[in-house]
C-alpha cells in the first residue's frame, strides 16, 4: 500500500508539472545546499584521500566558515540585535547515530570543529552559549572576535532604520516602528502569519551537507551564523538533529536551509529520511517535506536536500515571488568536479 501511495504521489506531481531533480551514481556522494563549490570540493577530496564521511562533512563545512559563504556562514555576518555574531553547527554520524552540536557559540570561528569535538569527547549532544565557548577553549580552539567591519556596518545601518526588521511582537513600544528595549504590551494579538520581510535568500544560507561514503556510511552537518538581527539567544534549526540535518545508514541523509524558526517546528531532515526509509525516491521525499510545511506556512522560505544510501539524490524548495529556484552542489564519480544542480521550487 505504501508503494502504491508513493507511485500515486509521483504521478500527481508529474501531472501538476512539479519539477523533479534527481540523480544517482556509484558511491561515494557529496551533496550540499547552495552553490558553495569549494565546500563540496573539500568534502570530496577528503573522501578520495581516505577520510571518513564525518571527516568530509567537517572539512566541507569548515571551508564555508573560513570563506564566510554568502556572509551567512562563519564569522563577520548576521549580527544579532546587540551587534554580535554567534554561530550554530552540528555534525551527525549515521552509523552510530551520534551527534555533536553547538548553539549560540561565541568568539570561536570553527563552529563545525567544536561540534565534532562535542561528538567525540562528550556524551552530550548540544552545548550552547558561553559554556560552549569554554568547552571549545578546553579543546584548543582560539577565543577571538567574530565581528568585522561588515557586520558592524550592518548593525549600524539596522539601528539607523529604527531596528527594522526585527522579530518582536506583542510588546511596547511598537516594534514595527521603534527600537527597544521592549516589554510585554499586556495583551496578545495572534498573528495570522509569521512576521516576514521580503525574502532575502542571502539571509538564511546555512550550509547543509550530506555525505554517503563508499562503504555506505552516512554523515550530515550544518554551519551557520543564523539570521540577521535575531534576538540574542535565538537558535534556529541548524544545530538541532532532525531539523538542520539527519543521517541514518539504514536509509540516507538530509539537510535543510531557510527560515530556521519555521523549519525547526517540522523536523524536515528527519522526516525526509523517514520518507526514504519508506521507499520514496529522494526527490519525492524532499518534495513531500516541503508540501507538508506548506500546509501551515505557505509563504515560508526553505529548501531540503536528500540522499539515499544507494547514491540517489534530490532536492526541493518552496516557491516564493523572490525565490523560484534552488541551487545545490553534487560531487560523485560521474563528474570530474563538483556540479551545480538547480531545482524549480514548488
Swiss-Prot record:
Q: What reaction gets catalysed by this protein?
A: N(4)-(beta-N-acetyl-D-glucosaminyl)-L-asparagine + H2O = N-acetyl-beta-D-glucosaminylamine + L-aspartate + H(+)
Post-translational modification note: Cleaved into an alpha and beta chain by autocatalysis; this activates the enzyme. The N-terminal residue of the beta subunit is responsible for the nucleophile hydrolase activity. N-glycosylated.
- Kindly state a single biological-process term from the GO annotations of this entry: proteolysis
Residue runs in coiled coils: none
- Residues carrying covalently attached carbohydrate according to the record: 38, 310
**Which residue pairs form cystines in this protein?**
64-69, 163-179, 286-306, 317-345
Its function? Cleaves the GlcNAc-Asn bond which joins oligosaccharides to the peptide of asparagine-linked glycoproteins.
Name the family. Belongs to the Ntn-hydrolase family.
Q: What is this protein called?
A: N(4)-(beta-N-acetylglucosaminyl)-L-asparaginase
